[in-house]
Amino acid sequence: MSISFSQGKLSSEQRRGVLHFVQQQVKLAALEAIRTVILDCLEAEVTTKLGREKGAPRKVGQVREIDWSCGNCGCKDANQFTRDGHYHRDLETGWGHVRDLRVPMLECQICHHDVICHFAVFEKNQRFWLDLDQDAIFSSGLCQSLREITERWGEVLGGNVGLRTVNERINQIEVRAQESHKQTIKDIPDVIQLDGIYVTIQGQNGTVKHDKCNRARHERKGEKMVVLVALGFWQDEERREVIDWQIAKSEDHEEWETFLNRLYDRGVTPENGLQAVIRDGSGGLGEAIDVVYGHSVIDQRCIFHKLKNVADASSKELKGDKHKEERKQLMQQAGAVYHAESAEQARENLKTWSDNWREKAPKSVATLERDFDATIAYFQLEGVNRQWVRTTSLLERVNRQLRRKFRQALSFGSHVGAEAALYLQIQRLHAKWTDTSWCSVSRNLSFDLAKANP
């Protein structure tokens, strides 16, 4: 080990040089260890498949069928296969570039063609190892951009890594997202909160333009879409989970109706335990709930959004600094209307508040009185934490996390990319709510993808 130490204290520059050298040696040692372990695994798998050690004779009279087959005749009898040397290849890993891996080869003795070997460690044409796939999913879930991921990979591997390379690995998760939209929900929540959050997704139009290399490209334009989200609550377990979402063109009742029908078909029905739906007053959600659920569930309007509308109305009626204290008093008393033990008491509180403010702020009073009973529907619920069902604030927190990803991405290049991003963010939130490591969750997702796409 050629490190120059001195009897005296090292300067900062000397110490930096020592640490850099040590890091390089550690990396080289790690790469050699990875290479050795992988080679041992490959040889061990070949020995297990063939059922014999190197140099041991074949048992030609016995059939030993395995999942590897000859690329020519299709034979799967391991006793017809023999070792046929190695081919050399490289592999990109999270530790760096592993060179000169000697991968075992097999030959079929019936037709003397190569046997197609599907090793557990990696596939034949796989450039990047599994740990980099895991890193892509983990990092995207933490809202890191494609450029940030490729920059880190490029530094580790000592070369350039394309944005598409990383993006394709992340977008593989979209398959899991589509599966989650179709699975039957067996454990039905007591309450669901519904809301929409806007996102920009790019799409192609009919206009064709030429790029710098004079290649014809369809012009891409961002389109504002809305993600309809359903957050479920289970009172007995005091847990929450995003049970579904849908990318839609708007919050019109047709889009909400399609989304609610899917939830209904997946088992989210009053017969299975659904008691209430919590929502704000915007869009066509109310009409969609009437169509899909009718009066079989409690339709609770968000109190926070109702009071926000009152605040907006009061700011127009009681303008200026001279009415600042009045506005503050009005809102404090409006919030106190909901400090009640029953629906009847809440209505009495509303009447008292309305009588006090009707002359000074008639529009504010009309705003709170409008559909007031829909904001106190939660009193009909039994055995449910009322703090969960008075507002959509918990779902707003979910949307805040989704917006964090949307702001980082600015816009998504396709619906596939948007679905993959939503799925990863929702899985990360579920991991957080259940005190599970996102690192382990993302690793398992990567294993599942590798299993689904062998």
List the predicted regions and their residue ranges.
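Short, conserved DNA-binding cores of transcription-related domains
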Residues: 1-119
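Acidic/histidine-rich catalytic cores and adjacent linkers
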Residues: 2-17, 336-454
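Short acidic (Asp/Glu) and glycine-rich catalytic loops that position anionic groups and cofactors
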Residues: 21, 114-115, 238-240, 303, ...
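RNase H-like nuclease fold core
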Residues: 55, 65, 77-86, 107, ...
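Short, amphipathic alpha-helical "recognition" segments used to contact nucleic acids or chromatin
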Residues: 129-143
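Short, charged amphipathic recognition helices of the HTH superfamily
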Residues: 142-153, 345, 350
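Conserved beta-strand -> loop -> alpha-helix junction used to position metal-binding or nucleic-acid-contacting
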Residues: 276-283, 288-333
